[in-house]
Amino acid sequence: EEACVREVAEGRPVEIGRLQRFATDTMMAKEGHPYGRAEKTGKRVAVVGAGPAGLACAHRLAMHGHEVLVFDARQRPGGLNEYGIASYKTVDGFAQAEVEWLLGIGGIKLEQGTRLSGGLDLDALIKDHDAVFLGIGLAGVNALRIEGVDLQGVDDAVEFIADLRQAEDLSDLAIGRNVVVVGGGMTAIDAAVQSRLLGAETVTIVYRRGRDRMSASRYEQDLATSKGVRIISHARPVRVIGNGAVREVEFEYTRDGAGGLEGTGETFRLAADQVFKAIGQTLEGAPDALRFEGGKIKVDESGRTSVPGVWAGGDCASGGDDLTVTAVAEGRDAAEDIHNAILVGQEEVNESSRPGNEPG
C-alpha cells in the first residue's frame, strides 16, 4: 500500500489488505470449494512445513490430482499466520479457518509434531515420494551475544508472540512494568505494541541504526508510537544488568563509520524488568545435503534445490523478501514446477543449471 500512487495524490492508498481480506472471507463463507480437483494421478508429494508456502504448495498440487502429505513440527498448522502475527492484528481462529478451507479441496493429509532431523529424514522422504517441498521457515533465533542475556526476564520476542496467539486468556500472561525491545523489524513492533496493550507502563524499542533503516514500515512505526511506545535509534545493547532477574539494560550510541556501524563510546541505561530480543531469525533443521546461500536454502527461480527431487520456498529459501504473500507465491510456483516434473517428465534437470553447480 505504501507504493500506491493514491498515497501521493490523495494522501491515502487503496487498502489492498482489507480488500483481499473481504474477498477471502466472502469466498470462504460460501458452501463448497471454488477450485476443482483434477483426476487422481497416483503421484505422492511430501510437503514439510504447514506455513503459507507449504500450504499453498499442497493446495496447488492437490488441485492437479496429486496426493499430498504435509508434515509440521508444531501441533497446529498455519505457520506464521498461526504463531507469528500479534494478537492485536488478527482475530482468533482465522488461521485455522483458512487451513480447513484449504483442506476442503481433498487429497491433503496433515501430520503434526514431526520435524526434519527430529523424526523426518530427507532421504527417506525422497525415496517414498515422487517429490519433496520444504517450507520449514526460520525456526531459529539470532543470539544476542552480550553479558546478562541469561537473566530472568530476557526472552525471545517470537516466542512471546506465539504464546500470545495460543493463550486462551491474555490476562494470564505476565508482562513487565518496564519493557525494552531490542530490534527494528515487525516482530519488535508487535512485541512492543502488545506489551503496551497488556498493561506495561513504559515500552521502548531500541534499534542500532536510524529509523529509516528499520525493516518495520513507517506505518508500523507510527502505530507503535501512537500506542505510547518510544523508539530510540542509533543505539546497541552492551549488557543486561540484574541480580538473577533483569533490572536495567545498558546501551551504547552508534554511528555509521567508514568500516560500518561503530560505537561512539557514549552509553545510557534503561530500567527494565522485561527484555524482548527481536534481532532476526535463522534457518534451523535443514538437511546438510542441501546447498545454502546467505544462511538460507539455495534455490533457482522455480524453487528447485541442489538435491534432485527437492524444492523449497518461503522464508527458508534464498531470494525472497520474508513476506507472507511472497511465500504463498513461491509455494504455488514450486507446485507447478513439481507437477510438470513428476507428470510431464521434466524431472531430469541439467546438473549445470542446479544451484551451486554452476560451471567455473
Residue ranges and their predicted role:
Residues 150-176, 259-322, 337:
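FAD-site-proximal beta/loop scaffold in flavoenzymes
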Residues 43-69, 187-196:
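N-terminal Rossmann-like FAD-binding beta1-loop-alpha1 element of flavoenzymes
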Residues 67-70, 74-104, 108-112, 192-239, ...:
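Rossmann-like dinucleotide-binding cores of NAD(P)H-dependent redox enzymes
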Residues 1-23, 69, 73-76, 107-108:
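Iron-sulfur cluster-binding cysteine motifs and their immediate structural context
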Residues 23-39, 100-113, 118, 141-198, ...:
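Glycine-rich dinucleotide-binding loop and its adjacent helix/turn
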Residues 191, 316-345:
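A conserved FAD-binding loop/helix module that cradles the flavin
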Residues 39-40, 44-48, 96-147, 239-250, ...:
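Feature captures the FAD/FMN-dependent oxidoreductase FAD-binding
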Residues 51-52, 76, 185-187, 317:
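Residue-level detector of alpha-helix initiation sites
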